[in-house]
């Protein structure tokens, strides 16, 4: 049976085992790893797990998101004495009472406290993208480490996951809810074959997948990221790739196109890609590789027109078509530049560029304890370390950190979009629980969460000359996940700061000792340092180049990836954190903070659409953007009666309320940039929570509380018998077009919305 282990328990006690290759800043606080123990589990436990798996499989086309049941079953067993309060239901014509809300909240927090880890964070599924596991399996296959790293049980669960998320037409999407794409279909087909599935295995599923691929143009029509993965594997030729010259890293930084000016996720993915392209690295050509060459193309492999294939992309994948200027650039580099740099004397410069690229790869690896900023560059960096030296210590140090990314649920084993969302979820959970005015009842929960947040703050900048490594300051920041990951993020720092400031207002005998003042000042310093000249805040760093650089975006599947754009979410979070800090520490950098808040609020108003909406770039979508837009403006001092932006924002949200109450927004809003209801106009508890929080903050209860009452009824009636809330459609997004799971949101936002509703709507009505 699978068992989730947390923190120091994830490390093998035998130092000769993988634990000897792990380093940590804080005894692995926040680390979450699934282990398989064949001796664990009673027959009843195993039957319960099997039933959950079967139920998911039977309903996989109607409900594509797992409910994270394996983790919940484990925590339920560990907290077997837990008995919740009786369930509450509110009839359609019945008023929502404070008693009903309070009992719902107690039931919700009681349950949510049972799935909190001992170190204070809330573990959960952060999967969703369907292109992550293939990169891992391809890398492990090339390096010969597949069976050593992924046990038979790991491989079985990965296959389960892929079969469960295969679409009816035989293909796979970019993410679990998306229609089939060539990128998803080819990579997941290849993954199954590398894991030992035969071309006719899977009850016809593999054959059906191959048919989808061939019917839609074959692997020659895969996206550029897919072409790269197939090239290193040996089932596609490097001649069919558009160039990624590593010499870009030798250019002067003053050039707008220097990689150091790109969004960190973009540059950290293309960094190892440059290395692999520059070396024209190809793994061993084995019988399975030769077989895949025959299976994936419409013509014999040696007859594929690789030059034509460079710019081929299946229409199903084409979210961001290449502009003409890009095609001209790639053609020039391919036909003129690359032939020169593959031969002496220019090849000497290529070798120098490759050495420089590897230095940056090693810097990233070492400063994230080999976790890396995300799963794509994690496995690419690992492959580069092996390509540089198959026996290197760097390669061995990468291996144990693979497990930080793997998560298992009833739908199988997936690779997460980060090493988790630990800090982010914990900071939100703290704010949600405190909003209920029931904090004193949850001393243990809040004390543990407080400790996690304190333990996860980044305490030092990265070593060396930050400018040379293109890094921003990080001392005082909070990361998205764990301190060992360590990349600083503007909104994570803001939400972490908001949480510890709220906790500092509660008695220390309830929530533990407050964080040191200097660490608060350090966090404020990071936030202030991240404001752009337009007043907005981007994610990890300042915006370092121009929007026109997006013309060079080579990834057909994603939008807005080249530079770190300012966002309503990051700008709002910064305002809220600084405004909260200013109330408690009015003498610290007051003028800078006031100016920062004013400029950020002006920025938020400037990017509001004419219909009153804000596009949410990290959640689905206009309800998420609206929540941040409204809360940011209110925190900056704007009010409904003196701010037209707030009035328009409220009108927009109210216009999207469903007839029966609540809000339900589809992920299609993100990719199409038009508000779209979920199929059948169903409410979603997370969208409903965001909209409620927005309207409450904007004073809706003083004008007409009816929409809030209807929404509260939706949330109360959605609660499950044990106090949990149901997992509904996917609610996270990145780069406009790829969805990602935030499994904790199903608990956090009903609690938060009902908490604010109880304290700010119902109580004042008394």
UniProtKB/Swiss-Prot annotation:
Name the active site residues.
491
Task: State a single Gene Ontology molecular function.
Answer: cycloartenol synthase activity
Which top-level enzyme class is recorded in the Swiss-Prot or TrEMBL entry? isomerase
User: According to its UniProt record, which reaction does this protein catalyse?
Assistant: (S)-2,3-epoxysqualene = cycloartenol
Entries under InterPro entries matching the protein: SQ_cyclase_C (IPR032696), SQ_cyclase_N (IPR032697), Squalene_cyclase (IPR018333), Terpene_synthase_CS (IPR002365), Terpenoid_cyclase/PrenylTrfase (IPR008930)
Source organism per UniProt = Cucurbita pepo
Q: What is the name listed in the Swiss-Prot or TrEMBL entry for this protein?
A: Cycloartenol synthase
Task: Please give the function described in this protein's UniProt entry.
Answer: Oxidosqualene cyclase involved in the biosynthesis of cycloartenol.
Q: Which gene encodes it?
A: CPX
What family is reported?
Belongs to the terpene cyclase/mutase family.
Record Gene3D superfamilies: 1.50.10.20
Transmembrane residues, as ranges?
none
Q: Which GO terms describe its biological process?
A: triterpenoid biosynthetic process
Top-rank lineage group of the source organism: Eukaryota
One cellular component term (GO) for this entry is: lipid droplet
Q: What is its EC number?
A: 5.4.99.8
The entry's keywords: Isomerase, Repeat
Q: Where are the PFTB repeats?
A: 155-196, 520-565, 597-637, 646-687
């Amino acid at each position: 049976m699978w068992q989730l282990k947390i923190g120091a328990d994830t490390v093998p006690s035998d130092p000769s085992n993988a634990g000897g290759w792990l380093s940590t800043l804080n005894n692995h606080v926040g680390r979450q790893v699934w282990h398989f123990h064949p001796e664990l589990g009673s027959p009843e436990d195993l039957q319960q797990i099997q039933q959950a798996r079967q139920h998911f499989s039977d309903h996989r086309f109607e409900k594509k998101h797992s409910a994270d049941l394996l983790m919940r079953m484990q925590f339920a067993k560990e907290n077997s004495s837990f008995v919740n309060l009786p369930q509450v239901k509110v009839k359609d014509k019945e008023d929502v009472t404070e008693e009903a809300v309070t009992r719902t909240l107690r039931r919700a927090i009681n349950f949510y406290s049972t799935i909190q880890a001992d170190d204070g964070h809330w573990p959960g599924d952060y999967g969703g993208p369907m292109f992550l596991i293939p990169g891992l399996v391809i890398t492990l296959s090339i390096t010969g480490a597949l069976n050593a790293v992924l046990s038979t049980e790991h491989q079985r669960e990965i296959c389960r996951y892929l079969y469960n998320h295969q679409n009816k037409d035989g293909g796979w999407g970019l993410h679990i809810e998306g229609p089939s794409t060539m990128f998803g279909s080819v990579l997941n087909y290849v993954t199954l074959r590398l894991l030992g599935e035969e071309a006719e295995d899977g009850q016809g599923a593999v054959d059906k997948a191959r048919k989808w691929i061939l019917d839609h143009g074959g692997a020659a029509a895969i996206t550029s990221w897919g072409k790269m993965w197939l090239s290193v594997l040996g089932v596609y030729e490097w001649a069919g790739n558009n160039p990624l010259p590593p010499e870009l890293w030798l250019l002067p930084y003053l050039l707008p196109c220097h990689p150091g000016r790109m969004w960190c996720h973009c540059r950290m993915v293309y960094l190892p890609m440059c290395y692999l392209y520059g070396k024209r690295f190809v793994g061993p050509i084995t019988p399975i590789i030769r077989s895949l060459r025959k299976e994936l193309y419409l013509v014999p492999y040696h007859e594929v027109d690789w030059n034509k294939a460079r710019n081929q992309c299946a229409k199903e994948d084409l979210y961001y078509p290449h502009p003409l200027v890009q095609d001209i650039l790639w053609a020039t580099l391919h036909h003129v530049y690359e032939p020169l740099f593959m031969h002496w004397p220019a090849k000497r410069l290529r070798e120098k560029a490759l050495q420089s690229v590897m230095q940056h790869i090693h810097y990233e690896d070492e400063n994230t304890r080999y976790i890396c900023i995300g799963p794509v560059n994690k496995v690419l960096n690992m492959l580069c370390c092996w390509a540089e030296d198959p026996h290197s210590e760097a390669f061995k140090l990468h291996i144990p950190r693979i497990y930080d990314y793997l998560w298992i649920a009833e739908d199988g084993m997936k690779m997460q979009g980060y090493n988790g969302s630990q800090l982010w979820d914990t900071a939100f959970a703290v704010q949600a629980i405190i909003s209920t005015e029931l904090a004193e009842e949850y001393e243990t929960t809040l004390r543990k969460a407080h400790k996690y947040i304190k333990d996860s703050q980044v305490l030092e900048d990265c070593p060396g000359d930050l400018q040379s490594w293109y890094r921003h300051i990080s001392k005082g920041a909070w990361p998205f996940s764990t301190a060992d990951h360590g990349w600083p993020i503007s909104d994570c720092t803001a939400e972490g700061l908001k949480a510890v400031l709220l906790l500092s207002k509660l008695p220390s005998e309830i929530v533990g000792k407050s964080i040191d003042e200097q660490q608060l000042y350090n966090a404020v310093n990071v936030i202030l340092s991240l404001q752009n000249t337009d007043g907005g805040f981007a994610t990890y760093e300042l915006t370092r180049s121009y929007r026109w650089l997006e013309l060079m975006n080579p990834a057909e599947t994603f939008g807005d990836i080249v530079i770190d754009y300012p966002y309503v979410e990051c700008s709002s979070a910064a305002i809220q954190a600084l405004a909260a800090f200013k109330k408690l520490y009015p003498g610290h950098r007051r003028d800078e903070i006031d100016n920062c808040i004013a400029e950020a609020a002006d920025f938020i108003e400037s990017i509001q659409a004419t219909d009153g909406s804000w596009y949410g770039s990290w959640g689905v979508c206009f309800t998420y953007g609206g929540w941040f837009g409204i809360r940011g403006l209110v925190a900056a001092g704007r009010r409904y009666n003196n701010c037209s932006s707030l009035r328009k924002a409220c009108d927009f949200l109210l216009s999207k309320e469903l007839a029966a109450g609540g809000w339900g927004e589809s992920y299609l809003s993100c990719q199409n940039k038009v508000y779209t209801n979920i199929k059948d106009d169903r409410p979603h508890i997370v969208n409903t929570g965001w909209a409620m929080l927005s309207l409450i903050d904007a004073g809706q209860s003083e004008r007409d509380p009816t929409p809030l009452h209807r929404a509260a009824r939706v949330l109360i009636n959605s609660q499950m018998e044990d106090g949990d809330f149901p997992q509904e459609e996917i609610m996270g997004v990145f780069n406009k077009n790829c969805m990602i799971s935030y499994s904790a949101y199903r608990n956090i936002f009903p609690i938060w919305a009902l908490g604010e509703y109880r304290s700010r709507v119902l109580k004042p009505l008394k």
